[in-house]
Regions:
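An N-cap/entry alpha-helix motif that binds or orients negatively charged groups
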Residues: 17, 29, 40, 50-56
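Hydrophobic faces of well-ordered beta-strands that scaffold small-molecule active sites
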Residues: 5-10, 40-44, 75-83, 110-113, ...
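Catalytic alpha/beta core domains of metabolic enzymes, predominantly
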Residues: 175-244
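N-terminal amphipathic alpha-helix/helix-capping segment at the start of soluble metabolic enzymes
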Residues: 1-18, 65, 70
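Glycine-enriched alpha-helix->loop->beta-strand junction motifs that scaffold or abut catalytic
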Residues: 38, 108-110, 134-136, 164-168, ...
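Short catalytic helix/loop segments, enriched in acidic residues and glycine
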Residues: 23-34
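Active-site beta->alpha loop and helix N-cap motifs at the rims of alpha/beta catalytic domains
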Residues: 46-163, 167-170, 180-181
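Alpha-helical segments flanking ligand/cofactor-binding loops in enzyme cores
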Residues: 32, 102, 129, 160, ...
Length: 244
């Protein structure tokens, strides 16, 4: 079985370890090497990158995306989108969501990972629909947590609902790094048995379990795992790409 890698160094690793403060010129020189590495995708935009470019780095986030696209012609570029919240901190109207998605794709994004923090799929419907209409890959997301009502069965139902919505892949997003290895195995296996889409697993090394959690996810059939190049890995970031 082939396992693919999404490299997070330009987005989530950058965001998790240094609050998304890495300016474009700090990573410009390495972009051609990242492009040749053979990643499934390069997560490079969305999340807090948009806000940080404007608020702290004095950069145009759209221009950053265009530069990355030009430097990485052979690798799919990926972004993280907060559903109806886009890259902001409030809900936006449907027409704004559709225009933002359209412009993201036009400026170079290939894959949009779309989530709602409370797994309310009504808040991602518009973004998913527009992503598909634009010819990009809509990756529907399940935000992982633990509680009396959050269990394997509830997440399998969410995965089925995402498949019915038309997404092209399902991502299990363990943003707090609290998913243990056995749960990762059971969850990935359960979802793979109930849907026909690729399953992606995203975690953090916050608790130190990240590498083993991803290993068990792969054993259960995960198609893609998120990792970060070693110098930007571990801690609150992703497990190291080289180790995995």
């Amino acid at each position: 079985m082939k396992v693919n890698f999404t490299e997070t160094v330009l987005r989530d690793a950058n965001q998790s370890l240094i609050a998304t403060r890495m300016p474009y010129e700090d990573f410009e020189a390495i972009l051609p090497e990242l492009d040749k590495a053979g990643y499934y995708s390069l997560e490079c935009w969305g999340g807090a990158t948009f806000d940080s470019c404007l608020r702290y780095l004095n950069e145009d986030p759209w221009e950053r995306l265009r530069k990355i696209r030009k430097a990485c012609p052979n690798t799919k570029l990926q972004m993280l989108l907060r559903g109806q919240n886009l890259l902001g901190y409030k809900h936006y109207p449907d027409d704004v969501v559709r225009l933002f998605v359209r412009k993201s794709v036009e400026n170079g994004i290939d894959i949009i990972r779309i989530f709602d923090a409370l797994n309310d799929l009504r808040n991602i419907e518009t973004a998913v629909d527009e992503t598909i209409k634009c010819g990009a890959h809509a990756s529907g997301t399940i935000c992982y947590t633990t509680s009396p009502i959050h269990n394997i069965e509830s997440y399998i139902k969410l995965a089925k609902d995402l498949e019915s919505m038309g997404v092209q892949s399902v991502c299990i997003k363990d943003m707090a790094g609290i998913m243990d290895p056995q749960t990762a195995y059971d969850l990935v296996r359960g979802i793979k048995e109930n849907i026909s889409l690729p399953v992606i697993v995203h975690t953090h090394s916050t608790t130190g379990l990240g590498p083993v959690t991803l290993q068990k996810a792969v054993e259960a059939g995960a198609d893609v795992i998120d990792t970060a190049i070693s110098c930007f890995s571990n801690g609150t970031s992703q497990p190291p790409t080289e180790t995995m």
